[in-house]
Amino acid sequence: RKRKSFPCRLEIIWIIKVAPTCGIVNTEDYIDGEDEPRCFYNPLRTTAKLVWFAKGYLEYRFPNAGIQNGRVRRLELSAELCSEAPDYNMEWPSDITLWINQREAGTWTCPSDFGGRRGKLNPDWWEDKNTQYGKLKVWTLEENGTYLDGKKVNDVSVTDYCLADGPFISVRIGVKEDAKHQGGVNLFGNSFGDYPQDIVMRILYE
């Protein structure tokens, strides 16, 4: 069996559909200010380390070269996430959904836009009143179903996601338009929050 690991930096955004409150920061400053979706098209987004939006989704694309002639046994995707409120709010739930190749892979109801203490990695200029950290969530696609943090969420097999069929693997993170808790998303890169990682995909295949 072989393993592939693909870290995907936050700035490599392919499809954007977001609404305020929203924004992007890098390790130095805000990119184009806050609450302006146009900032997601600024060339400086290539330095993004934290992105947030109240509604909508972002889509990332991962390579699938090398698995076309094999059998994928497992896909694991991990990211640090939380809800998005103005500043931060410990009572702000959000139903955050992951889609893989346009197929739903499970929803996590985040309880909070976390704050009250500084994120372990946050730069000094990031104000205490802002979102500080998230939770590291892990989605796993197995042959017998899909799991979130080790708990089975549906019976969709890893083969049902058709990972090798297209030229890439689509990963979409967002909040459904009809979600019960429409509390937005904060998505942390390797220089904000508590975990020194970007979005990471791991594939086990043979």
Question: For each predicted feature, which ranges?
Answer:
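Sequence-level detector for tyrosine residue identity
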Residues: 30, 41, 57-60, 88, ...
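Generic hydrophobic, helix-prone segments enriched in Leu/Val/Ile
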Residues: 1, 72-75, 136, 197-203
